[in-house]
Amino acid sequence: MILLLSAMPEEIAALRPGLTSSELQFGAGREFALGAIDAQPVVLAFSRWGKVAAAATAAHALSRYPIQAVVFTGIAGALKQDLKIGDLVLADRLFQHDLDARPFFAPTEVPLLGLSALPACATLAGRLEAAYGRWAEAEQQAGRAAPTLHRGAIATGDQVIG
């Protein structure tokens, strides 16, 4: 089962039409939609805004459902010049650009892990990339242009940049 989280209700609402055999459950002040997307069991949840809310929602879902992977989906800003609205970004590593636990740890270093960037799950990323490839091919066969898939680092933070 995959947990699909999003920080905005509109983002989860966009996924709901693809959910089959949906069942709503409630817990920790959140609504969890259980079902399947293309026969893959999933749980959809609006985590609310911020990393603490996302962590709390994920922790509750992980304690309640047989979650094997967590995917956070939704819109985001970008620093990459060739990224267009609708393009997909798949992480190979993740970091928090404004994490600062000095003087005990270097800027952006996750305390006690000795890492500034956390590696994404290569297995899940491969599955997502393969699914994108199948979808992009179907879009092209239907005469529609598919958004571009970009691979690379994804940063998060508490400061708005721009």
Predicted feature residues:
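Proline-aspartate-enriched helix->loop->beta-strand connector
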Residues: 66-71
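A generic local secondary-structure boundary/capping motif
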Residues: 59-60, 77-80
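N-terminal short beta-loop-beta anion/metal-coordinating cradle
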Residues: 1-59, 65
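Mid-sequence, gly/pro-rich, charge-dense loop/helix-turn segments that line enzyme active sites
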Residues: 79-162
